[in-house]
C-alpha cells in the first residue's frame, strides 16, 4: 500500500510517499508449547459416562510418556523446559485435574513432525507454536527498511516526473509503526498425529516495514 502527499509551502515544494516491504524469514529457533493434563482412563473406553469416571491417570505418568516420546523424536533433555503447573476443575465442587506446560526449543519443523508422530495424545491438552526466532533478525530488519525506502523513492520519482518535475533530495524520513514481526502459523494445532502436515504452510516469519519519506520537488 502507498500513501502520497504533494504540497507547496513555505518550506518549499515537496512530495511525501510511504513505501512498504515484506521480508520472509525461515526461523532457526522454534518454541513449541505442549501442555499435559491428568485425565480419566474411562474417557477413552467408548462406553463410560462422565459420572462413572474413576481411574485418574496421574500427571507423573503422562509426563513420563511425553518425555519418552520426545526422546524418540530426537529432542534432547536440555531443550525441554517446564513452563508452569496449574489445575482444572473437572466440575465445580469435584476433583480437579493437574496440568503442566513444557516449552521445547527446537531448530526445525521436522522435529515437530516427529513429536506429533510419537506422542500419545491421551493426556495432551494443547500443542502449539509459541515463538519463532532467527539469529540474523537485525540484518533482516535492515534489509526490509532499506527496501521500503527504495520503494518510496521509486514511487515519488515517477509521480513527480509525470508532472514534468524532478525529484530532489530527502527532507524527512519517518519509520512508521507496526514494523517488524508477524509470525505465520496457526495459533494452536490439533493434537491429532494426522495433523503433522498441517504445519507445511506455516513455517516462516514475515516482517513488514513501512517508511514515509518526504522529497523536495525541483524544476526540470
What residue ranges belong to the model's regions?
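Short, charge-dense linear interaction motifs
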Residues: 2-122, 126, 133-220
